[in-house]
A protein has these predicted regions:
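Basic, polyanion-binding surface patches
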Residues: 2-174
Length: 174
């Protein structure tokens, strides 16, 4: 039996498998976004690397959110959300929105157009506004499917990336 075949047949303890699973996915480079919404009249949101396009007809995206997060109870079908694709210069914003925060903790964050149904962050590489169409519970997270209502791409910029549990920027094309 080859070593690879032996590895496939060996049972791995659940905690070891969970740790290895997280380690494998930490190597998948992802763009960094902040999903935002109004909580009353205040900006609220969270950092997400799980944002992806789903469909062109209809225009649909998804993101995932932990059910234990402060944001999860604020989201529901029909709610408006904004998705801002961050630049490498916006790392501090990513860190801020990645941790639990007190109500009103983002009052000083620049919003591109506060009159919108969904807030969008100033200086981002791209903006998408969307309406939540469906929330599908899956384990300890929920998959949130959204119908896109608007999209805007900045003229240029350097994206913020997350890989191997740290931030990176895109320095050159290969």
């Amino acid at each position: 039996m080859t070593l690879l075949a032996q590895e496939r047949t060996t049972r791995v303890p659940a905690e070891d498998l969970r740790r290895t699973f997280k380690d494998v996915f930490s190597r998948l480079a992802s763009g960094v976004c902040i999903v935002t919404f109004w909580r009353g009249a205040r900006l609220h949101g969270f950092t997400a690397t799980s944002v992806t396009s789903v469909s062109l007809n209809p225009l649909r995206i998804l993101f995932c959110v932990a059910q234990a997060s402060q944001s999860y109870p604020c989201l529901s079908p029909g709610s408006a959300v904004g998705i801002s694709i961050l630049t490498a210069e916006q790392r501090a914003l990513s860190d801020r929105f990645a941790s639990r925060s007190a109500f009103g903790a983002y009052d000083d964050v620049g919003v591109a157009d506060a009159s919108r149904d969904a807030p969008l962050l100033e200086g981002a590489l791209g903006h998408i506004t969307a309406t939540i169409a469906e929330m599908i519970p899956s384990g300890d997270h929920a998959i949130v499917l959204c119908d896109v209502t608007s999209a805007h791409a900045a003229a240029g910029g350097n994206p913020l990336l997350y890989c191997s549990r740290t931030y990176h920027s895109l320095l050159h094309r290969i």
